[in-house]
Amino acid sequence: GRKVAVAAQDFTVIGGSFSEAQAQKVCKVLDMAIGSGVPFVALNDSVGARIQEGVWSLAGYSELFWRNTQASGVIPQISVMLGPCAGGSVYSPGLTDFIIMTAGLSHMFITGPQVIKTVTGEDVDLETLGGAQTHASVSGVAHFVAADEDEAFSITRKLLSYLSSNNAESPPRLPPTDDPVRADPALDTLVPPDGSQSYDIRHAITRIFDQHPGQSPTEPVSSFFEVHARFAPNAVVGFARLHGEVVGVIANQPAHMAGVLDINASDKIARFVRFCDGFNIPLVTFVDCPGFMPGTVQEHGGIIRHGAKIVYAYSEATVPKICVVTRKAYGGAYIVLSSKYIRTDMVYAWPTAEIAVMGAEGAVNILYRKRLAEVENPDQVQAQFVAEFREQFGSPYAAAASGHVDDVILPSETRAKLVAALDFLRDKQ
């Protein structure tokens, strides 16, 4: 029932090559989408520019790229890759909000295997160079991978169900079908007492947000729709519904790299936050992060520059922002991940939360290094110092008493708290 604008390339006609006339047709449709405030969906299946038209074909690409840029943040743009996309033609999908690739059928690359072989001597096949799996897990270009064209269209429809038609509207709200105060006692034991043990944050996300009946009464279906699932798995982002309303969900993933922030995770989070803010989607963030990934690879790769993108994204976001600290919230990572200090509206902490400049063990080793070297039983004394540090500086109750978090809540009551907070913030200006 949603209005959308669609442009499709037909590979059976001259390989779907991009001509001056095709450019005019696609640009006209995109202009209409912008003017009417409806999402734009591009079905890409083309060998690239129509060489025999010379520079006119390139001019057509330029006109399309310009319109993709003008539409950014105004209407949602989705690219569905159903075949090849090579050379300059990749920049139009690259400028859109979401890319859905079809496994085994679609390939994206700027320079093909033959050119790479000639210039660099490197042998690489199409799938390794620019296949769906490569772009979904390595480059991060693809947000979704479909098994075939039918699934690609199904993903497109599901994605559109979470998105507003334009930046002046709110996402479609569904009649609530789940109990807004539904408690889930299983969440109270989700986080292991040992901070070195991992858990899957998806288990919390799928239980907290709206569920609807599945094929089995004992197995409800979660409304959580993950985006970029294969890229930077140490962070989880996606859409969900909370009492019928669409929210953007961001979370560290302790089950992968302890949920640490690295370059790829920073880019993944920042881009998603900015998209949600642009299309009036409230943000809910779950924090369990020991910090930023150390090492020369990350430092030389620009972790400072990429990490700053998260600060910028959350700081400029004007939509309702709610944060839940589930366990570790250390140092700069705590600050950038929707903390109170960058104007998050509501911050909750589970009793397992540990909010501090750094982990208790590391802090004790620095603060009491000389004293530990002098005692006869350093392990016992260190354990005592660690316990004292956690209670005095890392306890969520200490953070709540100081106003750094708004409340310490039981994990089982998280859903009720989030529903109430979102209802309170609905008319946030």
Regions found by a protein language model. Name each.
Residues G1-Q429:
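Ligand-binding clefts of soluble mixed alpha/beta catalytic domains
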